[in-house]
Design a protein with these regions (language model features):
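Conserved catalytic cysteine-centered active-site region
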Residues: 1-15, 35-37, 49-56, 129-154
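N-terminal extracellular/periplasmic Venus flytrap/periplasmic-binding protein-like
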Residues: 71-172
Length: 215
């Protein structure tokens, strides 16, 4: 959405250059979620899936669209392999800006916690030693489900930003154009399958730009 705001402002001539960014901090949500007004009984009775956990929606989508546990695990192995190869080739070296911060570290033996200085300079999520055998040995989070700690999204904080500029200005300044903005679209689905909302959004965006998946 931030990128869309900047792109539209450039297209309207309001600005010629802008920065779009976003941040997600799961560490601020896990133990500090404000539950005031969180539950609304009439809606809960009518659409209980609004309050489903991510695990519940993931298992529901996997069952509805016939995605097996094996399918999920194989995709994870492929994804981990790709990111490991990209890291080894230095593909992300120019995209990650190191910065210093403090991190809370808890000693497993004593249970004591302390703040230490750290420099974040790489994505800590990838697990290059992931194998189908290791994933297959993990138990599902929910009984009878397909979601495990190995094939689910990780819990981590992250932030990203991109500089957007009018093409003529970029050319005038001799800056390399890494990509072009073609449009933005939103999609919506039922709460129980929220994880596939990107699908109708992509289809809408392709239709707006008169392209198909083959293009």
């Amino acid at each position: 959405s931030a990128a869309s705001f900047v792109a539209n402002a450039i297209a309207r001539g309001e600005i010629s250059c802008g920065m779009a960014g976003g941040v997600e901090s799961i560490s601020l949500v896990q133990f500090n979620l404000n539950f005031n007004g969180f539950f609304y009984e009439p809606l809960q009775q009518m659409m209980p899936a609004v309050w489903w956990t991510m695990n519940q929606t993931a298992d529901f989508v996997a069952e509805r669209y016939q995605i097996s546990r094996r399918d999920l695990d194989e995709y994870v192995v492929m994804s981990q392999k790709r990111v490991a190869e990209a890291n080894a080739a230095g593909k992300y070296a120019d995209e990650i800006v190191p910065f210093a911060t403090k991190m809370k570290v808890t000693d497993k033996a004593s249970g004591q916690s302390s703040m230490v200085d750290v420099t974040l300079d790489h994505d800590e999520g990838p697990r290059p030693d992931t194998t189908i055998e290791k994933l297959s040995a993990l138990k599902p989070v929910l009984e009878g489900g397909t979601t495990t700690a190995g094939n689910a999204s990780q819990l981590s904080d992250g932030a990203a930003a991109v500089v957007m500029m009018d093409a003529e200005l970029a050319a005038k300044r001799g800056l390399p154009i890494l990509g072009y903005w073609r449009g933005f679209a939103l999609g919506s689905v039922a709460p129980e399958e929220m994880s596939i909302a990107i699908t109708p959004a992509i289809r809408k965006l392709m239709k707006l730009n008169a392209v198909n998946a083959g293009d």
